[in-house]
Amino acid sequence: MNAPETIQAKPRKRYDAGVMKYKEMGYWDGDYVPKDTDVLALFRITPQDGVDPVEAAAAVAGESSTATWTVVWTDRLTACDMYRAKAYRVDPVPNNPEQFFCYVAYDLSLFEEGSIANLTASIIGNVFSFKPIKAARLEDMRFPVAYVKTFAGPSTGIIVERERLDKFGRPLLGATTKPKLGLSGRNYGRVVYEGLKGGLDFMKDDENINSQPFMHWRDRFLFVMDAVNKASAATGEVKGSYLNVTAGTMEEMYRRAEFAKSLGSVIIMVDLIVGWTCIQSMSNWCRQNDMILHLHRAGHGTYTRQKNHGVSFRVIAKWLRLAGVDHMHTGTAVGKLEGDPLTVQGYYNVCRDAYTQTDLTRGLFFDQDWASLRKVMPVASGGIHAGQMHQLIHLFGDDVVLQFGGGTIGHPQGIQAGATANRVALEAMVLARNEGRDILNEGPEILRDAARWCAPLRAALDTWGDITFNYTPTDTSDFVPTASVA
């Protein structure tokens, strides 16, 4: 009697019907060397218990490019080897054994030129709810020059904005009108006038002031521009106020933007929550009409703040620069809103660099050539006051808008005095810096000396002193200890 024959399972072929691991379908290639023309993405992933990190990385690559849950024969009708995204590197996250950094390369032909909506539909459209992964976060991206050149970028940029304002050698100053809701058009305009007359360069609508029963948008625009014109005449300076044109439809947003232009406004504003197609459309309108576009990052914290899941703001900032905003809120580090100092400085690099170099301490994982795209003016706003002027200039330099909302309008001597306090503090600090003084360490002394001759600044320092919202940041680099803002 013959011995029973051992039956061995036949190895699976790539296009055999059924379910196959993503890494076996070609979405993992540890030997892959990214091309200069690839779009690169870095994800922080937390695989489910028992899931191989390499398989999880391959799943991210697959689900953000061409894969579905089972083998499909129609892949063979495409240049599938080229169109498959490739996870090519997986690193453990320092001090966090459950998390991994996975690097994914995408062929440039996967993306429509000049469309952030298309880019995001692939990169973040599906993978964040994939069951084998507990959590995923998009930490950084690199775009090839060929892709960057399909975007027009900011219509104005830092240099042209300064030329239009005729203001050089210092940060710009602004304030958000408070309270953000409830004022009548006339009272709103009065707040704007007082702030600009006192020395600010800009006033600003807040994210949720649109057209409500207490103040129709047209009334606000009329009273605000009357205030801007009167303050400009009184001071001899070019002034502006960010008029929020955010509305329920693109048609209505265009209508409000046209009205702002007809009144002589130099700048309009939109909220991040309007979406990428709308942001790019408004950027195109601003380019055609010689207007500055301010972007308030309303809603970003819902997906940027948590370290293990969502999208890092450095990625949002890169998308916004491509999309063509001229201003964007990027954090203060010393204010009331989330922001690790080094991480926030990384956001400023994304806005202002001609070529952003890898800097792991700032959370920048890739070099990025911006291909002569104009630079974005970062905006520091949220819980800052005159007593922090030395910290703000030390952290962010000159090319930034420092917006003191409560730090202007909450001044005990009134709005105009609050604006004057901020302007005097700024000019005293810039002068001291230009004289070679160590403003970070000598800053409090410099402010006290300036306050001897400026009652509004003295009152501001007496009211807020050295108040800083120094909480432990939730979003920090995993490569270095968190720096202190003190």
UniProtKB/Swiss-Prot annotation:
The record places the site described as Transition state stabilizer at: K336
Q: What does the PTM comment state?
A: A disulfide bond might be able to form between Cys-278 in the large chain dimeric partners within the hexadecamer.
Q: Tell me yes or no: is tRNA-binding among this UniProt entry's keywords.
A: no
Look up the record and name the cofactor or cofactors this protein needs.
Mg(2+)
- The UniProt annotation places substrate binding at N126, T176, K180, R297, H329, S381
What are the recorded GO MF terms, alphabetically? magnesium ion binding; monooxygenase activity; ribulose-bisphosphate carboxylase activity
Chain sites annotated for binding Mg(2+): K204, D206, E207
Question: What EC numbers are recorded for this enzyme?
Answer: 4.1.1.39
Question: Which terms are listed as keywords in the entry?
Answer: Calvin cycle, Carbon dioxide fixation, Disulfide bond, Lyase, Magnesium, Metal-binding, Monooxygenase, Oxidoreductase
For this protein, the record's InterPro entries field holds: RuBisCO, RuBisCo_large_chain_AS, RuBisCO_lsu_C, RuBisCO_lsu_C_sf, RuBisCO_lsu_fd_N, RuBisCO_lsu_N_sf, RuBisCO_lsuI
Superkingdom, natural source? Bacteria
State the remark under miscellaneous: The basic functional RuBisCO is composed of a large chain homodimer in a 'head-to-tail' conformation. In form I RuBisCO this homodimer is arranged in a barrel-like tetramer with the small subunits forming a tetrameric 'cap' on each end of the 'barrel'.
What's the family? Belongs to the RuBisCO large chain family. Type I subfamily.
Q: What is this protein called?
A: Ribulose bisphosphate carboxylase large chain, chromosomal
Species whose genome carries this gene: Cupriavidus necator
Gene name linked to the record: cbbL1
